[in-house]
Amino acid sequence: MPMKGRFPIRRTLQYLSQGDVVFKDSVKVMTVNYNTHGELGEGARKFVFFNIPQIQYKNPWVQIMLFKNMTPTPFLRFYLDSGEQVLVDVETKSNKEIMEHVKKILGKNEETLRRERQEREQLSHPAHFGPRKYCLRECICEVEGQVPCPAVVPLPRELTGKFQAALRAGAQD
């Protein structure tokens, strides 16, 4: 994407991945009500401009709706899967204060994020074999230096079970 428009750095992958708010799984919808004019809503405008793209990138399952100039005071409303609503007043707050507050009340804590990251890394460990959906490799024959799969290249006679059974039977006689 070309670096054109207002503050194009907001669309870079590095900037988007720097966001640190990952919502809990119960958050389904986030609405932002703010005004485009006035001093009291300056933090909300900066929050929408700088931080909403990061939140969208980190939380693709959350629907985010923006309402401009429909309210006297800026606020955020979160709809949870249990039917509850969480209302956050953002009047006179800066965009950083808003991010910290939202992270504190509806964000996952560091321990949960660390545990989820560990589980993802464990699933993608190169020693695991299985369907491509879950593992990096389907068969041991895909590892360099291993014996190729008998489905692709036939095994030498000495390694087959029939040959070894015949050898044992001949030794017993």
UniProtKB/Swiss-Prot annotation:
Localization annotation: Mitochondrion
Pfam family, one: L51_S25_CI-B8
Superkingdom assignment: Eukaryota
Entries under InterPro entries matching the protein: Ribosomal_mL43/mS25/NADH_DH, Ribosomal_mS25/mL61, Thioredoxin-like_sf
GO CC entries: mitochondrial inner membrane; mitochondrial small ribosomal subunit; mitochondrion
Major location category of this protein: mitochondrion
Keyword vocabulary terms for this entry: Mitochondrion, Ribonucleoprotein, Ribosomal protein
GO molecular function: structural constituent of ribosome
GO annotation (BP), single: mitochondrial translation
Subunit composition and interactions: Component of the mitochondrial ribosome small subunit (28S) which comprises a 12S rRNA and about 30 distinct proteins.
Protein family membership: Belongs to the mitochondrion-specific ribosomal protein mS25 family.
Protein name per Swiss-Prot or TrEMBL: Small ribosomal subunit protein mS25
Record organism: Bos taurus (Bovine)
Classification of source organism: Eukaryota, Metazoa, Chordata, Craniata, Vertebrata
Annotated gene: MRPS25
